[in-house]
A protein has these predicted regions:
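Active-site and adjacent substrate-binding regions of carbohydrate-active enzymes
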Residues: 1-551
Length: 551
């Protein structure tokens, strides 16, 4: 294994959801100038790159993941000039820019789709059309947002496929003209100085051409990691990603280790790295998201071990707890009360000790929590609103559903970034597009920066350590307590260096008896005021975590 990593192999990436980051116009919606305004803060944190979720022209049915024009910026967010300034200002601080590419589908407002409504247009073949009867779709596949994955178009008397909202029509990747257009989009942004791309649900781009009924499920096995997915990504990589030096991270929906070993192979023939979500389903009993359930920490550790060991020396992992589709991790796996700070630090220390590229989602670095919404009118997310309506229809209790949304909704991570204890948490001078978290007076950036023992400084140190200690980049992964539901203990080794991580996942004190620990250890990180200089028998406090290093 080489000692000279790609920048992303010992770097850390910060995800920005621009809509909720910083508003500079008083519109109540964040914008690109808001990102520029906060670059100094991101530089202080020490991140290597920022990934921006979509800011393209969009009807905003799915918060910008329904793109109507891939090369134009939605006026809500600013202009191309603003974007160019953002690139320049970020690069002057050593921060790279990663853009989100939504290439599985477009908005039905996209010019291609409008043309495609005419059966004679060449753009008809840009989408997936099938025959059927008005009441009988081509097959029984389900949309990920509920209902059938097919929408009838009366004028042309055919159905089009939409794996997500009906306003998000799936592109037909079998058509070389589609792939050529998408390559042009990548070139457009590479020309403007973009360093990387995050590819939305990119393992869904190849569908089984037979479009069979799924007798045992919702259809996903016929389009997830589909027959030509690797071939298509190989072509995109050969023609655009590698020639333009773009880092790529694929968001992989319901994928497998075996596929990701190919997508993110260290040979670099498809993508640089992959996101998978298996570890964020350990509180989905029986695979069911819309329930209230405690996380299964043994399952969580088993999944991390599977991916850490399976990808080691084969392919590259992306590491994350949070994004714009997930609830806040400290609320989910930690504590919102008296132990919020140690819990947030512990979760950071467990993740950032692993192999891969860590991603931090805005607000995670100050320990932001779920907002505790209590009314359905507080929500904006299409998935949450659809599920509430669908499950109410099935006779489920409204209060129960609201409790589930308060813990599982995607809106939990979409509330405005908490900058200060001032009006609207310093996010906007106007009316915010979605309500604020109810604790922004206590939990905000200003307070975090003023407190040397805040969660922020733990993240800052973890980011710096990643560049200093090669064992973090290249080391293997050994789970030393795989069956403990309360302690997470792992070891990483590389060329005579050893990192030992111990964490208490519970709010109770826990005894820990390490095996024989020879040699000299150095205390590197801890989340309470003091910790043992050496790994030895000890009682771990609630959510306590410690890193020791041996060279």
């Amino acid at each position: 294994m080489t000692n000279l990593p790609h920048w992303w192999q010992n770097g850390v990436i910060y995800q920005i959801y621009p809509k909720s980051f910083q508003d500079t116009t008083g519109s109540g919606t964040g914008d690109l100038r808001g990102v520029i305004q906060r670059l100094g803060y991101l530089h202080k944190l020490g991140v290597d790159a920022i990934w921006l979720t979509p800011f393209y022209v969009s009807p905003q049915v799915d918060n910008g993941y329904d793109v109507a024009n891939y090369t134009a910026i939605d006026p809500t967010y600013g202009t191309l000039d603003d974007f160019d300034e953002l690139v320049t200002q970020a690069k002057s601080r050593g921060i790279r820019i990663i853009l989100d590419m939504v290439f599985n589908h477009t908005s039905t407002q996209h010019a291609w789709f409008r043309e495609a409504l005419n059966k004679a247009s060449p753009y008809r073949q840009f989408y997936i059309w099938r025959d059927g009867e008005p009441e009988t779709p081509p097959n029984n596949w389900r949309s990920k947002f509920g209902g059938s994955a097919w929408r009838w178009h009366a004028e042309s008397e055919q159905y089009y496929l939409h794996l997500f909202a009906p306003e998000q029509a799936d592109l037909n990747w079998e058509n070389p003209a589609v792939r050529a257009e998408l390559k042009k989009v990548c070139e457009f942004w590479a020309d403007r100085g973009v360093d990387g791309l995050r590819l939305d649900v990119v393992n869904l781009i190849s569908k089984d051409p037979r479009f069979p009924d799924d007798l045992d499920g919702d259809g996903r096995r016929f389009y997830t990691d589909g027959p030509r997915a690797h071939e298509f990504l190989h072509e995109m990589n050969r023609d655009v990603f590698t020639p333009r030096g773009l880092m790529t991270v694929g968001e992989m929906s319901s994928t497998s280790l075996e596929h990701c070993q190919r997508y993110a192979a260290l040979t670099g023939s498809e993508l640089s790295m992959t996101f998978n979500f298996h570890h964020l389903k350990v509180d989905y009993p029986g695979g069911e998201k819309w329930t209230l359930a405690k996380p299964d920490f043994v399952a969580l550790k088993t999944l991390f071990r599977h991916w850490q060991q399976g990808m080691h020396n084969v392919a590259w992992n992306a590491l994350f707890w949070c994004n714009h589709d997930q609830p806040r991790i400290v609320s989910r796996f930690g504590d919102e009360g008296e132990y919020r700070v140690p819990a947030a630090k512990m979760l950071a220390m467990v993740l950032h000790g692993m192999q891969g590229t860590p991603y931090i989602y805005q607000g995670e670095e100050i320990g932001m929590t779920n907002p505790h919404f209590t009314r359905i009118t507080d929500y904006r997310d299409v998935e949450s609103l659809n599920m509430f309506a669908e499950l109410r229809n099935d006779g489920r209790d409204a209060d129960e559903l609201l409790a589930i949304l308060a813990s599982k909704s995607r809106d939990n991570s979409r509330t405005p970034m908490q900058w200060s204890n001032g009006d609207n948490a310093g996010f906007t001078a106007g009316e915010p597009w979605i309500g604020l978290g109810d604790n922004y007076q206590e939990i905000n950036v200003e307070a975090a920066l003023a407190d040397e023992s805040s969660v922020f400084y733990t993240y800052q140190k973890l980011i710096a350590l990643r560049k200093q200690e090669a064992v973090l980049t290249w080391g293997d992964y050994q789970d030393l307590l795989p069956n403990s539901p309360v302690l997470w203990c792992y070891r990483r080794e590389w060329k005579g260096q050893t990192l030992l991580v111990i964490a208490n996942l519970s709010r109770e004190i826990q005894p820990w008896q390490p095996g024989q620990m020879r040699g000299n250890w150095q205390l590197v990180m801890h989340n309470y005021e003091e910790a043992s200089p050496q790994p030895c028998a000890m009682t771990l406090r609630p959510f306590e975590a410690v890193w020791w290093l041996q060279k």
